[in-house]
Amino acid sequence: MFETFVNFFKTKEVRNKIFFTLAMLVIFKIGTYIPAPGVNPAAFDNNQGSQGVTDLLNTFGGGALKNFSIFAMGIMPYITASIVMQLLQMDIVPKFTEWAKQGDVGRKKLNNVTRYFAIILAFIQSIGMAFQFNNYLKGALIIDPSPMSYLLIAIVLTTGTAFLLWLGEQITQYGVGNGISIIIFAGILSTLPSSLIQFYQQAFVGQSDTTMAWLQVAGLVIGLVLLTMGAVYVLQAVRKIPIQYAKKQSTQRLGSNATYLPLKVNSAGVIPVIFAMAFFLLPRTLTMFFPKADWAQQIANTANPSSNIGMVIYIILIIAFTYFYAFVQVNPEKMSDNLKKQGSYVPGIRPGEQTKKYITKVLYRLTFVGSIFLAVIAILPILATKFMNLPQSIQVGGTSLLIVIGVAIETMKSLEAQVNQKEYKGFGGR
């Protein structure tokens, strides 16, 4: 592992990309400490803040929400917009469906619409969030709660979201990995120290008997190790479907019989968990404008994964999004057509429609295992806070762990591929 990291920095091109990414993340972190104009960040000092979805937003944003900084909205509006856009492509909006079939050209059009939609959503959510937090903090957040103040805050927070999207694009183009994922990854890691401090204060400070606290620590460490091992296994595990080439039957002894079609146990990665949590923001956005209404409070309680009903909805959403995104990532029909064009086939399965049905069947089974695993990982920390008296920040621990591991794995693969490509070019003399 250490040798792998050394190789990353030996390659000039990869090294420059790493340093560029780190520079962009420093800018991101600095922005989380710059408060929005007209707010009093100290209002949060003596309050625990909201829980559930809000805690996750704060974690994804690197603590920007609790500071009510210019990046307080983070990139969640973009994620929510992406969910809506992908759903609209399913023959709901014909034009979007048409673009989705146009390859790179159509994808660029959809990305542009998604960005515009994200900006509109960020503006609406930022106004609602300012109302909600100012009401929650009994008017202590907004220094001058006039319409112009709310408008200014909304413009600044929306601009912050737009800047983060631009920052993510720069990382994707000139840095390492997927920019949006890297920003979320960095945000989660940056809030880890404060979560540990909160746990220490709740478990040890002012306690005469720390036996239970040490048992909690032991349980957390064991749970963390097991969850990490399980996450790595499921995110990396693949089902190898053997394939053969019709024109190479005589060359099996040369290794053609070892050819296979890899299908991940969890083809969707950690996206379903992020999507499920972002989905909770849609009804909560409306309730932000009516913080004192009983019906709004009921919706807010339901749209919270820490509540009993919210937990059930959370599980259903994770499973549903896992299936949805798995078939976005893996297209059995296209895969079957490609095998047929290459003159290859799955032993015992007829090419064409039968192969498509077989791949679909295997993908359904694999996705079921992957979706259950994601749901369990996301729910276990929530249950732990309910029954083990752990800090509320632990609730998002499972989700955060999955994202950190998933992004780390994909980033490592990307770096290794770039290093190998550079070495190959050097060997071939270009």
UniProtKB/Swiss-Prot annotation:
<feature type="transmembrane region" description="Helical">
    <location>
        <begin position="368"/>
        <end position="388"/>
    </location>
</feature>
<keyword id="KW-0653">Protein transport</keyword>
<comment type="similarity">
    <text>Belongs to the SecY/SEC61-alpha family.</text>
</comment>
<dbReference type="InterPro" id="IPR002208">
    <property type="entry name" value="SecY/SEC61-alpha"/>
</dbReference>
<dbReference type="Pfam" id="PF00344">
    <property type="entry name" value="SecY"/>
</dbReference>
<keyword id="KW-0472">Membrane</keyword>
<feature type="transmembrane region" description="Helical">
    <location>
        <begin position="215"/>
        <end position="235"/>
    </location>
</feature>
<comment type="function">
    <text>The central subunit of the protein translocation channel SecYEG. Consists of two halves formed by TMs 1-5 and 6-10. These two domains form a lateral gate at the front which open onto the bilayer between TMs 2 and 7, and are clamped together by SecE at the back. The channel is closed by both a pore ring composed of hydrophobic SecY resides and a short helix (helix 2A) on the extracellular side of the membrane which forms a plug. The plug probably moves laterally to allow the channel to open. The ring and the pore may move independently.</text>
</comment>
<keyword id="KW-0811">Translocation</keyword>
<protein>
    <recommendedName>
        <fullName>Protein translocase subunit SecY</fullName>
    </recommendedName>
</protein>
<feature type="transmembrane region" description="Helical">
    <location>
        <begin position="390"/>
        <end position="410"/>
    </location>
</feature>
<keyword id="KW-1003">Cell membrane</keyword>
<feature type="transmembrane region" description="Helical">
    <location>
        <begin position="179"/>
        <end position="199"/>
    </location>
</feature>
<keyword id="KW-0813">Transport</keyword>
<dbReference type="InterPro" id="IPR030659">
    <property type="entry name" value="SecY_CS"/>
</dbReference>
<keyword id="KW-0812">Transmembrane</keyword>
<feature type="transmembrane region" description="Helical">
    <location>
        <begin position="18"/>
        <end position="38"/>
    </location>
</feature>
<dbReference type="InterPro" id="IPR026593">
    <property type="entry name" value="SecY"/>
</dbReference>
<feature type="transmembrane region" description="Helical">
    <location>
        <begin position="270"/>
        <end position="290"/>
    </location>
</feature>
<dbReference type="GO" id="GO:0043952">
    <property type="term" value="P:protein transport by the Sec complex"/>
</dbReference>
<dbReference type="GO" id="GO:0005886">
    <property type="term" value="C:plasma membrane"/>
</dbReference>
<dbReference type="GO" id="GO:0065002">
    <property type="term" value="P:intracellular protein transmembrane transport"/>
</dbReference>
<feature type="transmembrane region" description="Helical">
    <location>
        <begin position="148"/>
        <end position="168"/>
    </location>
</feature>
<feature type="transmembrane region" description="Helical">
    <location>
        <begin position="68"/>
        <end position="88"/>
    </location>
</feature>
<dbReference type="InterPro" id="IPR023201">
    <property type="entry name" value="SecY_dom_sf"/>
</dbReference>
<comment type="subunit">
    <text>Component of the Sec protein translocase complex. Heterotrimer consisting of SecY, SecE and SecG subunits. The heterotrimers can form oligomers, although 1 heterotrimer is thought to be able to translocate proteins. Interacts with the ribosome. Interacts with SecDF, and other proteins may be involved. Interacts with SecA.</text>
</comment>
<feature type="transmembrane region" description="Helical">
    <location>
        <begin position="308"/>
        <end position="328"/>
    </location>
</feature>
<dbReference type="GO" id="GO:0006605">
    <property type="term" value="P:protein targeting"/>
</dbReference>
<feature type="transmembrane region" description="Helical">
    <location>
        <begin position="117"/>
        <end position="137"/>
    </location>
</feature>
<keyword id="KW-1133">Transmembrane helix</keyword>
